Every structure is written in structure tokens, then in C-alpha cells.
Amino acid sequence: MKKHRKCKKIIAFVTVLFIAFVAVIGLHKTGIYRFDFLKDIYKKIDFQLSTNELNIPQDALSFSVYDIEQEEYLFYEGDSQLPTVASLAKLFAIDYALGKVDLEDIVEVNQEVLELVPAGSSLANLYAGEYTVKQIMEAMLVPSGNDAAYALAYHIAKNELGEGYTATEYIDYFMTELSEYLIEAGYSKTNLYNDPSGASMQADSHLDDINRVALKLLNYDFVKECIGKSEFSIQTPQGEFTWKNTNEFLDENSPYYNCLLYTSPSPRDVEES
């Protein structure tokens, strides 16, 4: 009887060793034992823990989270909806402008164009004076400055039309050209109408266009730099401007701090719309 039990234990032990051996061989062949695999598992667990309390607002028409590294959507809801584009219109304006001007070009902001900015707008609080194109774009991206969007539109239109037009005519010209660009560039589901800042309630877009333009702009270092900080400052002849980022995920005092980032130091970069 004792011999029988001992034999069973030996068989069980050998079986366990055999299973362990097969498992090790399998892990080796599939590469699962490698650090990269473990790192990938960690990233997935970390992302799930970071987003398990993520609640999509009930009135949100569409919502997406895109994994830049894996080139895939993690969330994609509201494909059939055309949400009001709002401040995301600035992304399309910047994309268009980058083909028209250089980042170090000087933009003359005047009081006439500042007075066109719709009441109640989010502002970079620009003063009349000189700024670089790069600074104007940063003012559009960080505090979502509608005044900066109007200044950029005015500058580009005036460069092309020359002197002799009103600020309204310059803005109208810019929007006509921008609308044509959107069609040519394949942003077929975006209509910005008559406002470069996104203040028009008629303007709408689609997740596909929004994510595409966001990913395109993230190829620019200055874009990644300015949107990756909770506060951002520029030095101009008018003085220093410091803006608070409208992205609450970057605000240490926000309950959403570090939950999702447009760009992050980790291997996983996530772009959220």
C-alpha cells in the first residue's frame, strides 16, 4: 500500500515536471517570457486601472480614445453622430496654416481683429502687438484662445489679399480657403462655416476627422511640448503670457490628473477626443 502511494507521488511529481517543462518550452517559443511581453501586460493593466472609473457624459454625442503606439482605438462611440466641433476647429485651422506660414513668421495682432472675437469666448488674452506664428498657435492650443485663432486667420488672409480689406473680410476669406482645404485634404465630414475658432454652433465634425488631424499635429514637437504641460508660458514684446492648459488630465489638482494624456513619458501614448 505504501509502495502504491509512493508510486503515485512519483508519477504526480514527474507529471508536474513534464508540464512545467512543456510550459517553459511554449513560453520560450512564443516569446511570452520576454520582458517586452510583461511590459505590454503591465501597460494594459495600468490602462484599465486608470480608466475603470471613466464615465462618458450622458450628453456626449461621440467619444474616442486612440492608442498611438498600437494604432488602434480603445474606445470609439458615436460614429453616426456629428458633434459640434467647438474648439477642436482650431486644430483644422492650425493644420491649414502650417502649409501657409513659417513658425517664426511675425504676426501683427491689432485691436480691429480682437474686437471680432465672439463674446464669452475662451481667450489667450492677447494684446495688440507682435507675436510669432508659433506663439499664436500655442495660444490656440493651450488656453484654447479664440482671439489667437482670429489673429492667425487675419494674418494669413492679409498676406494673400494685401491691404485694403476689413477684418471681417479677411476672416471670411480665410474661412473660404480653409473650407476648400478641408475638402482637398480629405476632412470630408467637417464643416467649420464662418468661424476659425469653433465658436459657430453650426460647425460640426466627426471622430475620424478629429482624430486624424490630432495625430497629424502631434508630429510637431512644439505641439507635443505645449499641450503636455498644465501651464505654459511665452515671452513676447508685450510681456510674458502664462496660460493654464484646458486639459484637466494635466492638472495636479484635478480628480482626472494623469488618467489619460495626449502624450506621456510611458511607452503608451493616448490621444483622446
State what each model feature region is:
Residues 262-269:
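Conserved small/polar residues in nucleotide/adenosyl-binding loops
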